[in-house]
Amino acid sequence: MFAVIKTGGKQYRVAADDVITIEKLEGVAGDKIEFTEILMVGVGADATIGAPFVEGAVVSAEVVDQGRAKKVIAFKKRRRQNSKRSRGHRQHQTVVRILDIAAAGGKAKKASKKTEAAAEAAN
């Protein structure tokens, strides 16, 4: 089973036990995270595409590490002016391990219990 998740303004295709590097998320190593912005869920050639997200689909993950990316150098030079400027930047990143992909019904079960309790209270 695979899913396409959206986090940090980017899209990632993930499967169970994948380890991916994404934009920084709050948390320390060992924390559990749930991604709810799921764009697509599928098994093999069979896939469910959301509009824009798949209702009730949840991807569970665990934070493995917090770190920083390789340094990116921004260099500006003005020719014949003996003027140059160099600046470096390192983006913060989070490494996560995908634990489980729950298709439609992963989080909806909790909501359906509330609606059942509300229906019983109304009767």
Swiss-Prot record:
InterPro entries: bL21-like, bL21-like_sf, Ribosomal_bL21. It holds the Pfam family Ribosomal_L21p. GO terms for cellular component: cytoplasm; ribonucleoprotein complex; ribosome. The gene is rplU. One of its GO terms (molecular function) is structural constituent of ribosome. Part of the 50S ribosomal subunit. Contacts protein L20. Keywords: Ribonucleoprotein, Ribosomal protein, RNA-binding, rRNA-binding. It comes from Sinorhizobium fredii (strain NBRC 101917 / NGR234). This protein binds to 23S rRNA in the presence of protein L20. Belongs to the bacterial ribosomal protein bL21 family. One of its GO terms (biological process) is translation. The keyword Ribosomal protein applies. This is Large ribosomal subunit protein bL21.
